[in-house]
Curated annotation (Swiss-Prot):
The gene is recF. Its main location: cytoplasm. The RecF protein is involved in DNA metabolism; it is required for DNA replication and normal SOS inducibility. RecF binds preferentially to single-stranded, linear DNA. It also seems to bind ATP. This is DNA replication and repair protein RecF. It comes from Citrobacter koseri (strain ATCC BAA-895 / CDC 4225-83 / SGSC4696). GO terms for biological process: DNA replication; DNA synthesis involved in DNA repair; double-strand break repair; SOS response.
């Protein structure tokens, strides 16, 4: 699907905007602080229920307003879908799909698979394991029907188990939680392992094109010892878990490690190379989704020119065009994106929250 229409009201510094969009490249050009990133963030929020620059809802709603409103129209091969999200200062959300309320944010995420590339996105490579788990879980969410329910139940059970660890004295008292937790943990770990194995060749091929000077390897670590049943690990770790008051092993501790020439990429690659690698991984995810399901990602790229020279920008632009996906790109100057433009592209100028084309 592509986003053909976007309405923004009281989001960040944007009072009101109604944008007719291209199914190909859409460029947002303006000075720092003009609001171009806010447009990208509005699209991201419409598909995720939360912003990517702040978790505090008060910072996202325009000054002295009570809520923001986002609406979009998604065009698929056979039908159009109307979607909407309203969120107030208390954090209460209302999701509307095709005119009916009561929907969940996860439904928006399923309708709008998107990849976000920002200057802060290096956390995928040099941040904690939670960022790489999120990378895997994005793929599992869009490829496995039961993943979201299983993942939600896992979070609930871990929270309950950790609370119980403060009160119990014997492992047998934890068995009611572990009876539910163990099969969920093993299923989620299996899905993650299958996804990481399935996408490995896509990542290798894309990374070879972007960073041919390095030999890159990828490894999935499930969060507990290899060749060991999770049930055995939980029982064996009981005393330590009770002392820590949290569950030290499991899928919530999984990681997905990337090495260049045998060393961690964060210790080996320059910032420009790290950005290229991040872009390669996001592209590989999108291409894998298209091959497996026929669905295309929507790409959001903030500050396109940062960290990349002309040759690398050209390579990224070429690969993005080859995906035939909808792409939104912000840049300080139109000169940075003119070579990506074609007859189907749209160029928007953003100034103090006002957007013109």
């Amino acid at each position: 699907m592509s986003l053909t229409r976007l309405l923004i009201r009281d989001f960040r510094n944007i009072e009101n905007a109604d944008l007719a969009l291209s199914p190909g490249f859409n460029f947002l050009v303006g000075a720092n602080g003009s609001g171009k990133t806010s447009v990208l963030e509005a699209i991201y929020t419409l598909g995720h229920g939360r912003a990517f620059r702040s978790l505090q809802i008060g910072r996202v709603i325009r000054h002295e307003q009570e809520s923001f409103v986002l609406h979009g129209r998604l065009q698929g091969e056979e039908r159009e879908t109307a979607i909407g999200l309203t969120k107030d200062k208390l954090g209460d959300s209302k999701v509307r799909i095709d005119g009916t309320d009561g929907h969940k944010v996860a439904e928006l995420a399923h309708l709008m698979p998107m990849q976000l590339i920002t200057p802060e996105g290096f956390t995928l490579l040099n941040g904690g394991p939670k960022y790489r788990r999120a990378f895997l879980d994005w793929g599992c969410f869009h490829n496995e029907v039961g993943f979201f329910t299983a993942w939600s139940n896992l979070k609930r059970l871990l929270k309950q188990r950790n609370a119980a660890l403060r009160q119990v004295s014997r492992y047998e008292q934890l068995r009611p939680w572990d009876k539910e937790l163990i099969p969920l943990a093993e299923q989620i770990s299996t899905w993650r392992a299958e996804y990481s194995a399935g996408i490995a060749q896509d990542m290798a091929d894309t990374c070879q094109q972007f960073l041919p000077e390095f030999s890159l390897t990828f490894s999935f670590q499930r969060g507990w010892e290899k060749e060991t049943d999770y049930a055995e690990v939980l029982e064996r770790s009981f005393e330590r878990d009770r002392m820590l008051t949290y569950t030290a092993h499991g899928p919530h501790k999984a990681d997905f490690r990337i090495r260049a020439d045998g060393a961690p990429v964060e210790d080996t690659l320059s910032r420009g190379q790290l950005k290229l690698l991040m872009c390669a991984l996001r592209l590989a995810q999108g291409e894998f989704l298209t091959r497996e399901s026929g669905r295309r990602c929507l790409y959001l790229i903030d500050d396109f020119a940062s960290e990349l020279d002309d040759a690398r920008r050209g390579l990224l632009a070429s690969r993005l065009k080859a995906t035939q996906s909808q792409v939104f790109v912000s840049a300080i100057s139109a000169e940075h994106v003119l070579d990506m433009s074609d007859k189907n592209s749209k160029m928007f100028t953003v100034e103090k929250g006002k957007i013109t084309d």
